[in-house]
Regions:
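Membrane-embedded alpha-helical bundles of polytopic integral membrane proteins
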Residues: 1-233
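Active-site catalytic microenvironments for nucleophilic, acid-base chemistry
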Residues: 199, 203, 252, 287
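Hydrophobic, small-residue-rich transmembrane alpha-helices and their short perimembrane loops
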Residues: 238-239
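Interfacial loop-to-transmembrane junctions
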Residues: 251-275
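Juxtamembrane boundary at the C-terminal end of a transmembrane helix
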Residues: 284-292
Length: 292
């Protein structure tokens, strides 16, 4: 009972933080979201680094954190000053930092190639992946608000629907070797939840509230509704894949949670594992719509 109470309180606090960040971003200033995502990237990198260190050579964390910070600076300068692709600029920083890492490892007596591989892994997951979430904030209106809201609606809806449908119907396991509690019925429920979230946001975009917070059409005519629903579906798939990938890492290194930072909920990565993959899918989908 005490654990349930702790989980509810922490869950409520997380919800309030998410809503506050979204509203401050959409109604006040874009920097709130940038700072939030950078904090997730740094916190997530520390957790993943600590996790894989339990079984594999320890990543060079200072280089990972430097990649996150310098990559963010390059991203913002590219988007706001030079007016070129932020994602491209970020990955240029990643490439430079990888070269610096190789030189550093070659000159070190304590580190070897395995440390370099571990470091590069954390550079990509979760740091580079979360830069796509950062990318939402620098999309043109109304894609910016739509993308942010889709991510923070679809992923939670997927998790909630998957939990309740899976707990109720049970049935055959989805990936018992990776996550014994996940069922096929739960996965289907999650897909329904993500699709419902996309549909609800479509209807919200048609209201005065949606207009007030910066939402709008993703495309013209009937295809607008279809795109909201399709993003909900594919982002739900990505959310569940991200969840399984995080579970795979935790099982490989023999841990239950990435940390105990969030009482009853584990660590940062335990809360955003699905979002890490979903943000990539949503960003690419919306980028294609913008290019059309």
């Amino acid at each position: 009972m005490k654990d349930i109470k702790k989980r509810i309180i922490t869950g409520g606090a997380i919800f309030v933080v998410f809503v506050a960040v979204i509203l401050l971003t959409l109604l006040v200033h874009w920097t709130f979201f940038d700072v939030f995502v950078l904090a997730l990237a740094v916190g997530g990198a520390i957790e993943v680094s600590n996790a894989i260190s339990k079984r594999f050579p320890r990543p060079v964390l200072p280089i990972v954190l430097a990649t996150a910070v310098l990559g963010y600076v390059a991203y913002v300068l590219a988007q706001k000053v030079v007016k070129i692709g932020g994602i491209t600029s970020f990955f240029c920083v990643v490439l430079v930092m990888c070269l610096a890492l190789i030189v550093y490892v070659m000159c070190s007596k304590k580190l070897n190639t395995n440390n370099a591989v571990s470091t590069m892994f954390v550079m990509i997951y979760p740091v580079a992946a979360l830069m796509y979430m950062l990318g939402f904030n620098h999309l043109p209106d109304p894609y910016r608000a739509n993308a942010i809201l889709l991510l923070f609606a679809v992923s939670p809806f997927t998790d909630v629907f998957a939990f309740f449908v899976g707990s109720t119907l049970k049935g055959k396991k989805l990936c018992p070797k990776i996550s014994p509690n996940k069922t096929i019925s739960g996965a289907i429920g999650g897909l329904i939840g993500g699709t419902v979230a996309g549909a609800l946001l479509y209807f919200l975009s048609l209201t005065s509230v949606g207009e007030f917070i910066g939402m709008g059409a993703l495309s013209a005519g009937v295809s607008n509704c279809i795109n909201f629903i399709c993003i909900g579906f594919v982002a739900s798939v990505a959310t569940q894949v991200g969840d399984l990938f995080a579970s795979f890492i935790k099982r490989a290194v023999g841990i239950k949670d990435y940390s105990n930072l969030l009482p009853g909920h584990g660590g940062i990565m335990d809360r955003i594992d699905g979002m890490v993959f979903a943000c990539i899918v949503i960003y690419l989908y919306v980028a294609i719509l913008i290019a059309l």
